[in-house]
Amino acid sequence: RVCYAIPLPIC
């Protein structure tokens, strides 16, 4: 999966 950090890191 792809991890996003907007605003917290969520994978």
Swiss-Prot record:
Q: Where in the cell is it found?
A: Secreted
Q: Which cysteines are joined by disulfide bonds?
A: C3-C11
Query: Which coarse location class describes where this protein primarily resides?
Result: secreted
Organism of origin is Hoplobatrachus tigerinus (Indian bull frog)
| Keywords annotated in UniProt | Amphibian defense peptide, Antibiotic, Antimicrobial, Disulfide bond, Fungicide, Secreted
**Described function:** Antibacterial activity against B.subtilis, E.coli, S.aureus, M.luteus and P.putida. Antifungal activity against S.cerevisiae.
Lipoprotein keyword on record: no
What are the transmembrane regions?
none
Q: Which GO terms of type biological process are on file?
A: defense response to bacterium; defense response to fungus; killing of cells of another organism
Which organs or tissues contain this protein? Expressed by the skin glands.
Q: What is this protein called?
A: Tigerinin-4
Any one cellular-component term (Gene Ontology): extracellular region
